Every structure is written in structure tokens, then in C-alpha cells.
Amino acid sequence: MTTILKHLPVGQRIGIAFSGGLDTSAALLWMRQKGAVPYAYTANLGQPDEDDYDEIPRRAMEYGAENARLIDCRKQLVAEGIAAIQCGAFHNTTAGVTYFNTTPLGRAVTGTMLVAAMKEDGVNIWGDGSTYKGNDIERFYRYGLLTNAELKIYKPWLDTDFIDELGGRQEMSEFMSQAGFGYKMSAEKAYSTDSNILGATHEAKDLEFLNSSVKIVNPIMGVKFWDENVKVPAEEVTIRFERGHPVALNGKTFTDDIELMLEANRIGGRHGLGMSDQIENRIIEAKSRGIYEAPGMALLHIAYERLLTGIHNEDTIEQYHANGRQLGRFLYQGRWFDSQALMLRDSSQRWIASAITGEVTLELRRGNDYSIMNTVSDNLTYKPERLTMEKGDSVFSPDDRIGQLTMRNLDITDTREKLFNYAETGLLSSSASTGLPQVGQLQDKTEK
């Protein structure tokens, strides 16, 4: 039997990821009217633009849901966000400005926790609002089936009957009004927004055009730092980690990770920290563009990597970055819980994050403009006395360095011979216009 149902399974229970917006409201009502038995599941992800979560299940019941549940996903989402920071699981960057994979993290948590709740209710068919051109349709597909092997997928937006009747937002609004709910469309924005406690994604519509800049976006987690009329005074903030876990901000210790992330968002948001404009490759290899906010994630990430560079050696840091980029891709593709991702994640958390204990002080200014003011840790391998230029006791002498340099003669000789070989085969030019060594000429002189 096929996993994806193209038409409404009449008479059967269908779980719908219900946001309370026009799309899912119309879909739920339509499914009930057509004879299905819809169950509504709403994820509380700590969305900064959601005012009343309790109202959402009540509306679902009004629209015909057999049952409606609100699932608090915030604790798990923050835990996954901190894990991503510990592993550096971020692969999309532009000129050093990072996208913190906040939407993929949200999908990993939503896709597993909502389907687990559905399974408890005996609901084995799942629908959500993802479209066939995006990443989420595959992410939810993977996470849903990982959680419930018996799961079937029904998406109204892939059902031609639904599309023919309610193919646009205007038709959906009229459908709701005719049913007596008087649903009014919200004011149309120049882009769409998806958010959770870790960050916000702004994309589509006007933002599909690269000549539309960040300036058309109204941030929901921070300030318009690019607007000269917005006052953004500099601010010092101290972040403390213990064994890779953020525990304190500005001297205040948090026992609740949700509250810590909210406070990190408030601090970073006051400066517009963590906002980025990215061109990325979707799972299907087509490029898309998004503008992202993640003030708390950015704040914690900066402090974490500052401690990382002061504590671990070069090879470990290099492996952290390489594994982090690969893990970020797995996360983006909906493979956060696949074995290849768990392997990378476990190694970074076990051998890298466990040593990250200390405190970093930053001065935040506008946007991603900041300075590192101080770094303190008992685990630092940074020892200024080892390389001081001042006179005094040293851990090694000039004679030690002469010996070390002499040992380099071995690989320098090997490299010179390779360069001669490259010149002989024409791979290296002896032209004066190149920046390469004139090895051909050097070889001639050596032979003479």
C-alpha cells in the first residue's frame, strides 16, 4: 500500500499539524465536511509572533476537529538547538555570517513529537501544510515515518480535489465565511515568516528577488539595526558555559534552558545579532533565498566558539568544523536522527563540548558587529607566557628552534624536487608573470 495518499481517506482519522492560520483552518473544515475525521495537533515551539497558544486548539474544535491537542515542544527544541551549537551543525554561511538551521531544528522536533502524539490517539494518517517544492515535505516525511512505521501521509495541498475547490487564499477565506466563521485574511505581507524559539525565517514573495534586501523585513526577534533612526547602544554581556552547556548570562544562572534561550534572544535581539541573508541549496538542489533571525543562537555560538579555540588543539578544531558542516547538511536534509548524524553528533558532544567550560564577555553593537572583551577558563591551553616577546624564562630556547627548523629540511627537499618535476612536465611555468617559484630556472642553476 502506498505511503502517500493522493485523495482524502473518507471515514478515517487524519492528524493535521494545525497552526490556526487560514490554510490549516480551511483544510480542517474541508476534511470534516468531506467525511474524514480530523484530529488537530498544535506544536508550541515558542514562536515569538504567537500570542495565545491555548486559543488555537479551541478554534480547531470549532472548525470540526474530533479532538485538538497542544503539544509543548519547547524543552526538546531548545535541547536540540544547544546540541547544534555544541557540534557546530551549521553549513550555510555567507562571508562568515551563519544561518543557524533553526527551521530544520524545528521540523526535527515537530515531526517526531506530533506524530508520537498522534500515535497515542490511534491516528496513523498525517497531514501538514508543506508544499511539494520545499524542504519541509521531505523533512516531515522522514521524521514522521521514523516515529511511526505505520504512518500514511495525506496532504490537502497535494490533493487535486482540494486544490480545485480551495486553490488560493481568497477561495479559502470565502469558504470559511460561507461556513459561518467569518475568517478574514490577514494583511498580505511582502514575504512569509516561519518562526520558533530558536529563530525566524523570512522568505518567498518579494524576497525571492535578490534586489529586495533585508530592509523590507520587519524583524520579530530583534531591531532594525540598519535603520539609523533606531538607537542601539553598545552593551556588554557575559556568557558562561559548563561542560559545553550554557548556564549563565550576565552572572545570572539558569536552571531552565527555555528561560536561558529567551533571555539570550532578548539580549541579542536588542542589537539585531544573528540576522543573515543567505542563498542556499534546497534538498532538491534548487537554490532559494532566505533572511534569518537567531539572536540567542548567535550569542551562544560566538561565546562557545571563542572557548573552543582557546581550549582545543588545531586538529580537533579542524575536525569540529568539518564534522559540523556535514552534520549541518544532515540536519537541513531531515536526517538529524539518522545514524550518520548521531555518530558525528556524539563525537563532538563527547570529546569537544565536554571540555568547554568558561566565561566570555562580549560587547554587542549593531547587527553582527561585536568585540570579544574577555575570555576566562580553567581549561584554556592558550598560555601567553609560551610565546611572549618579552625577556624571561621560556619553555624552549633558540637552539631548540634551530633544531626544529633543521628537521624541516627533509620535507623542504622533497617539496623542491616535486616542484622541479612539475616544471619539467609543464605544470609549472617559468614565466615571470606568474606568482609561482621560478623552479625551472632554479633547476638550471643547480645543475650548473
From Swiss-Prot:
It comes from the Bacteria. GO terms for cellular component: cytoplasm. It catalyses: L-citrulline + L-aspartate + ATP = 2-(N(omega)-L-arginino)succinate + AMP + diphosphate + H(+). ATP binds at residues 17-25, 43, 129, 131, 136, 194. GO terms for molecular function: argininosuccinate synthase activity; ATP binding; protein homodimerization activity. L-citrulline binds at residues 99, 135, 139, 192, 201, 203, 280. PROSITE patterns: ARGININOSUCCIN_SYN_1 (PS00564), ARGININOSUCCIN_SYN_2 (PS00565). InterPro entries: Arg_succ_synth_type2_subfam, Arginosuc_syn_C, Arginosuc_syn_N, Arginosuc_synth, Arginosuc_synth_CS, Arginosuc_synth_type_1_subfam, AS_cat/multimer_dom_body, AS_multimer_C_tail. This is Argininosuccinate synthase. It comes from Pectobacterium atrosepticum (strain SCRI 1043 / ATCC BAA-672). The lineage of its organism: Bacteria, Pseudomonadati, Pseudomonadota, Gammaproteobacteria, Enterobacterales.
